[in-house]
Regions:
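Active-site and adjacent substrate-binding regions of carbohydrate-active enzymes
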Residues: 1-542
Length: 542
């Protein structure tokens, strides 16, 4: 089975995630758009990435940042037109970059034509495209709650029925039990494949097989049957990359999702490592120090268990997560060193690495002085709730600085010009004030920058197959500072070794490997033998 997998282009690929709203504005309205991305393709080619994962750009009322789609076969005017999208796919292809689309197949917007028809009458051909239950007003079918708070059922008086929504009331769940719904979805995906889409990231895909009467939302009984049919009818007709977003995935489920026989997805996003710095049993806002030993154990487990029978997605950042250099590095004194250290650890592992826009510049979290400067709905809701619960403003702002989603969404920092070169207008979200120091223009003029370090990591993955195929062995498992592992393929071994802290760390491995070839290193001059300096990281081959 391992053999069949090797031909897939995505095995040694590196993917760059763009949050279009914050990447590059081309028309001065303060919102990033598709033409802006086209203008920056040469920058991405220089970095060396193979594909762009585009956060949602389909037509949407934007109730949930585009994850509420009202037309799967059109582009939201905020980002441009269908012609712009076709041009982006074409221009990216000229540079050997594929475009991965973000699709939401669990639910649509309530403004989608299907739902507008569905609520006209119980006899409407589109009625069964959604999940309905008869009932009485005020007496819910059951006590299920939506992810965004409140009941998961919404009353439609004309029909005397409730519809089911796992997310907002404006995101009714699609009824995957209905073969007509599935056919519509497959036809839409084939249409995008025809237009040249290189792959798909599938939002909350583990929730499509819900059974609300049994209170089952994710991992429903027919989930793998549905995914395998989806794959057969669409993805397997082209050499695409497909990524399932599966918050509920454990190792065994991930093996099914990313089976090398290609029956489901290329890989999944799992989030076990991302939840390690919150207090047990509490919300993401209740921050706890990162247990480095636990982080090593979790990442090593996924490396070992999926080797040869599945495939990992490797990521520190996305549009919902705080900037990794602020989160688990040091974004002040050791910003450059810790940004490079975190990159070294991730890019040495087996799987497909994802770089989130600005990560390659070492962009940091933002600390706006006032809540009015924030735009993220989750952040604003939490602020209100916690004030009512008696938290102090300082405590709440501390949580927002650490975990708020706007940390990832401040505009891309292109230059030291006004608004960081992102827009000639007023940006939809303020630019991080540190753009005068941290920006692409200054990174590109400095050979020791974070940007060129990422470029080199990407090249190493292409040059040495050990990073793609090699076995993984964790070393110094209980050490609270040193994160070290070996990748081995045939006679080739690579040591990846890093100090995950701002104090020097003893590391005897260095003397054992002193005759090896240093592939990459985030310090310029040699230090004391057997000691790793703050956030020092390297890869050594022998």
């Amino acid at each position: 089975m391992e053999g069949t997998r090797k031909e897939h282009w995505w095995r040694d690929a590196v993917i760059y995630q763009i949050y279009p709203r914050s990447f590059q504005d081309s028309n001065g309205d303060g919102i990033g758009d598709l033409r802006g991305i086209i203008q920056r393709l040469d920058y991405l080619k220089e970095l060396g990435i193979d594909a762009i994962w585009l956060s949602p750009v389909c037509k949407s009322p934007q109730d949930d940042n585009g994850y509420d789609i009202s037309d799967y076969q059109d582009i939201d005017p905020m980002f441009g037109s269908l012609d712009d999208m076709e041009e982006l796919i074409k221009e990216a292809k000229k540079r050997n970059i594929r475009i991965i689309m973000d699709l939401v197949l669990n639910h649509s917007s309530d403004e989608h034509r299907w739902f507008q028809e569905a609520k006209k009458s119980k006899d409407n051909p589109y009625h069964d495209y959604y999940v309905w239950r008869d009932g009485k007003e005020g007496v819910y079918p059951n006590d299920m709650r939506s992810v965004f708070g409140g009941p998961a059922w919404e009353w439609v008086p004309e029909l005397e029925q409730y519809y089911f929504h796992q997310f907002s009331v404006k995101q009714p769940d699609l009824n995957w039990e209905n073969p007509k719904v599935r056919r519509e979805i497959y036809d839409m995906i084939l249409w995008w494949m025809e237009k040249g889409a290189g792959g798909f990231r599938l939002d909350v895909i583990d929730q499509i097989a819900k059974e609300p009467d049994q209170k089952i939302t994710n991992n429903g009984p027919r989930l793998h049957e549905f995914i395998q049919e989806l794959s057969r009818e669409t993805f397997q007709k082209g050499d695409l990359i497909t990524v399932g977003e599966t918050w509920g995935a454990d190792i065994e489920r991930a093996k099914l999702y990313s089976n090398p026989d290609g029956s489901e997805f290329s890989m999944v996003f799992q989030f076990e490592h991302i939840c390690l710095d919150q207090q047990k049993g509490k919300s993401k806002w209740d921050v706890a120090p990162l247990p480095v030993v636990k982080l090593k154990q979790v990442l090593a487990k996924w490396q070992r268990e999926l080797h040869g029978c599945g495939w990992n997605s490797l990521f520190w950042n996305n549009h919902d997560l705080p900037r990794i250099v602020s989160r688990w590095g040091n974004d002040q004194k050791y910003r450059v060193e810790s940004a490079k250290m975190l990159a070294t650890l991730l890019h040495g592992m087996q799987g497909t690495p994802y770089i989130y826009q600005g990560e390659e510049l070492g962009m940091t979290n933002v600390r706006f002085a006032d809540i009015s400067q924030y735009q993220d709905i989750e952040t604003l809701n939490m602020y209100k709730e916690r004030l009512d619960e008696g938290y102090s403003k300082e405590e709440i702002m501390h949580s927002i600085y650490a975990k708020g989603r706007d940390n990832a969404r401040t505009p891309m920092q292109w230059s030291g010009e006004v608004n960081a070169g992102f827009t000639k207008g007023t940006p939809w979200l303020e630019v991080n004030p540190n753009y005068t120091k941290i920006n692409a223009e200054s990174e590109l003029s400095d050979p020791d920058s974070v940007f060129y370090y990422y470029q080199k990591l990407i090249r190493l993955r292409k040059e040495y197959s050990v990073f793609v195929n090699g076995e993984f062995t964790l070393l110094m498992e209980e050490d609270p500072q040193v994160f070290a592992y070996i990748r081995k393929e045939g006679d080739t071994e690579v040591l990846v070794c890093a100090n995950f802290s701002e104090t020097p760390a003893a590391c005897d491995l260095l003397s054992e490997w002193k005759d090896g070839e240093v592939l990459i290193w985030n310090y310029k001059e040699k230090g004391e033998t057997g000691v790793l300096r703050p956030y020092e990281a390297m890869m050594i081959r022998r």
